[in-house]
Every structure is written in structure tokens, then in C-alpha cells.
Amino acid sequence: MSARHGQSSYRDRSDEFFKIVETLRRSIAPAPAANNVPYGNNRNDGARREDLINKSEFNKRASHIGLAINQTSQKLSKLAKLAKRTSVFDDPTQEIQELTVVIKQEISALNSALVDLQLFRSSQNDEGNNSRDRDKSTHSATVVDDLKYRLMDTTKEFKDVLTMRTENMKVHESRRQLFSSNASKESTNPFVRQRPLAAKAAASESVPLPWANGSSSSSSQLVPWKPGEGESSPLLQQSQQQQQQQQQQMVPLQDTYMQGRAEALHTVESTIHELSSIFTQLATMVSQQGEIAIRIDQNMEDTLANVEGAQSQLARYLNSISSNRWLMMKIFFVLIAFLMIFLFFVA
């Protein structure tokens, strides 16, 4: 009897158990995961997973670009401090050239990365059509625009620093030419000023000897001074040779310095030209985004006008309904008739 009673009271409640488990699983883990893919729709879970991967990839690229722009700005501030030095004897040309090349390469790489990020965002916008995808597209467009403006400001600042550097180099060159021309006009060598004395000594040597004219009284006065005057000419020639050797040694140094300054100036000017092209490209991208924003603004204005028109029409219809008493009486009679039919025939 007990066995029969146990068999009659048995009931399979596996379906209820699975339903409870499914409900708890959805309430605890609403997001799709790898371990519960068999319980849900595989296609929807795959789309959500791909969406999350694309979103994380976009955020990763945007964060890397923002960090690189910040590092480039720090290097640019260091370059600005070096370029502000106006002393001829404290001119870090080598360090300025190295920083200029590094910053130019970083700005070019950032520009390429920003173009790739914009293409990646456009590919994401083409895939999504619902409201959620449109919100994400608006957010990503805002991030890209912010990065564009930051890179544009950095490029403009870099161009201003290079322009200031070019002006300082031109000022230094004009000063150097001014001092070199003054030095060539007014020589400060004391031996050069003694050239008239040497001419006098040569003239005294060309005068005929006193005893040749028969005047023996002046011979005792002129003969002792001739050796002294003759000894001054070798010293003068030696000093002139030393001066010429020093000038010949200074010529290669001046040529090397002038060549280095010319190369530095040419590098700065070519960098400014490349930055102008990058700045023009960024301005074109920003203007395109501005045109898109203008079109969106116009669409929003049209939508707002349509909503206001619909609201006015609904308010007018509401006023017409509320003022129609005959319609209210009809509705009241219909309700009374329905209630009477329900009470007499159904209940």
C-alpha cells in the first residue's frame, strides 16, 4: 500500500526547475558571457560580444592618441624654452634640431592614427542603425572631434615655435654679419698700425749715404740707427705671417658654422611647410565635421518644428473634444447600456 501511495504522489517538476534556473540566470547575469552561450540566442550574443570588442578597441585607440598628444605637448614646451634663448653663445642648435625632428614625426604619426580612428568609427556607424548605435556614434564622433582640436592646437603651437626659432636665427645672423663687417673695417692689430714706421725706415734706407755727398759730420748720427730700423722689419713680417695663419685657421671654422646654421634654418623652414600641410588637412577634417554638425542641427530644428506642430494639433483636438457635450452624453449612454446588458444577460 505504501509503494502504491508513493507512486501515485510522484510528479515530474523538472520543467519548473529549469524555468526557475533560467529566470535566476537572466536576473543575475544579464550580459552575455562565454559560459552561458548555449542557453541564449547565439546570434544575439555574438553581435553583443562583437559590439563590446569594437567599443573597447575604439576606446583603446582614443586613449593612446590622447596620451601621445599629451607627451608631444610636453616635448613642445621644452622646445619652446630652448627656442626662446637669444644669446649667441648659448644656442643649443643640436638639441633643438633633435626635438624638432622627434615632434614632427610624432605629429605625423598622430595625424595618421587619427585618420585611422575616424575610418574605424565610420565603419562602426555603417553597421548600426538603432537608437543605441546612434548614441554610441554621437559619443565616438565627439571623442574624435576633441582629439582633432587638441592635435590642431599642438600643431599650431609647434608652427609658432619654429617661426620664432627662424626669426631668432635671422637676428643672430644679422648681428654676426654686422660685427664681422665692423671688424674688417677697423683692424685692432697694433703691428698693422706700425706700417707707416716701416715705410719711414724703408725711405731712410733709400736716402744716399752722407759720406757719398762728402758730409762727414752727419755720418756719426745716422749710422747707429740703421741697424735698429733694419731689425724692426723681420718682427713685422713675423707678426703678419702669424696673423695670416690665424685668419686661415678661422676660415674653415666660420664656414662650418655658417653651413650648420644654413642647414638648421633650411630644416626649420621645411618643417614649417610640412606642418602647414598637416594643419590644412586637420582643418579640412574639422570643417567636414562642422558641416555634418550643421546638417544635424538643421534636422533637429525641422524635427522640433514638426513636434511643435503636432502638439498644437493635439491640443486643438483636445479642446474640441472637451467642449463637445453631446459626445460626452453619447459615451455616457453607451456605458450605461453596456452595464445594463452585462447585469441582465451575463450576470
UniProtKB/Swiss-Prot annotation:
Organism for this UniProt entry: Arabidopsis thaliana
Complex and partners: Part of the t-SNARE complex.
Parts of the chain that traverse the membrane: 326-346
Cytoplasmic membrane side: 1-325
Region annotation (Disordered) ranges: 172-191, 208-251
Vesicular face residues: 347
Protein name, as recorded: Syntaxin-32
GO CC terms of this entry: Golgi apparatus; membrane
Polar residues compositional bias, start-end: 177-191, 213-222
Annotated GO MF terms: SNAP receptor activity
